[in-house]
């Protein structure tokens, strides 16, 4: 299964890949998201190590059961050959109603078919009030006219 754009990445392809990942994650559909990764993809997400699509699906199912009303924005930081680095922020609340903005960086490595083979994510959670939220679009894809991270001063 091929998942264009394929490496080596230029600036346009890297931005497209980041937006595709953002859109998939904003769908909050673990099975759909997992298809962007190799069968044996290796992840480090915070302090958790995950291997393979089944592990990714299980992880994302747990994540989105806990991180409610999730909204994510990604932005390319750097790219070279088959690697892309992104920074991101996402907003969510827990089951008590406490809102958070989570900030992070991801390093991605892709195979020749454009599937992500390696993902390293470092993430920090900042408690915020509901009034501090910046991501207000309806569930799903961020609208094209919604500001990105740099536009929001994040």
Give short role names for the model-derived ranges.
Residues 1-9, 58-154:
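A beta-strand edge to alpha-helix "cap/lid" segment located at domain peripheries
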Residues 13-16, 30-84:
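A solvent-exposed, acidic/Ser-Thr-rich amphipathic alpha-helical stretch
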């Amino acid at each position: 299964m091929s998942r264009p754009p394929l490496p080596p990445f230029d600036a346009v392809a890297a931005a497209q890949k980041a937006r595709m990942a953002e859109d998939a994650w904003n769908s909050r559909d673990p099975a759909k998201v997992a298809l962007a990764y190799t069968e044996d993809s290796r992840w480090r997400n915070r302090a958790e190590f995950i291997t393979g699509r089944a592990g990714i699906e299980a992880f994302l199912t747990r994540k989105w059961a806990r991180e409610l009303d999730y909204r994510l924005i990604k932005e390319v930081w750097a790219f070279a050959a088959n690697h892309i680095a992104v920074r991101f922020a996402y907003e969510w609340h827990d089951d008590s109603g406490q809102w958070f903005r989570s900030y992070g960086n991801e390093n991605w490595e892709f195979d020749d078919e454009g599937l992500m083979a390696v993902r390293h994510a470092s993430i920090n959670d900042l408690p915020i009030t509901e009034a501090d939220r910046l991501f207000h679009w309806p569930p799903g894809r961020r609208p094209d006219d919604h500001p990105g991270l740099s536009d929001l001063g994040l």
